[in-house]
Amino acid sequence: MSLRERCARLLEALGRRFGIEGLAFDERGLCALAFDRRMTVYLAADTRLGGMVLFATLGEFEPAERPDLLLAMLRGNFMWRVTEGATLAVDPEKDVALLVQCLSPQGLEADQLEARLEGFVNAALSWAERLQRPPAGAPERAGLAGMMLRV
């Protein structure tokens, strides 16, 4: 069985676990799953890497403006301790932060994929939230009142 076939069968079995009959890759080879309307995770069979790739966009990110966050992302990648085995990255063309993971489909069952996906989603949500926080020491926004001038 080819990698694409194995990944397609895994995805279909995952869909059954979620109560989604016929879950499959689209014509581009992607499957998008939305979680709590807060995070979309894409799955794809990648023959170049030999696995099923999970990826999620965490938000806009300009590394030069947030060196503190860039350092946190590098530290987060160390031994994958706080990324559930995934890797944090920055898309240089779009200035967005991503979480990416490649899973070997060999011996992977739908329940194991579900568990890995859950860990991935939790890590993605955590890092997306962290991306939205202002840098340490940044002045707090005061809303409209803070922007008003007294005349």
Name each model-derived stretch.
Residues 1-41:
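Charge-rich, low-complexity N-terminal segments
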Residues 27, 46-48, 93:
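Structural motif
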Residues 31, 50-52, 95-97:
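Hydrophobic residues embedded in beta-strands of well-ordered beta-sheets
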Residues 41-45, 50-60:
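A short acidic-to-branched-hydrophobic micro-motif
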Residues 57-102:
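Short, internal acidic amphipathic alpha-helical interface segments
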Residues 72, 103-134:
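Ampiphathic alpha-helical segments that act as solvent-exposed interaction surfaces
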Residues 131-151:
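Short, highly charged C-terminal tails/helix-capping segments
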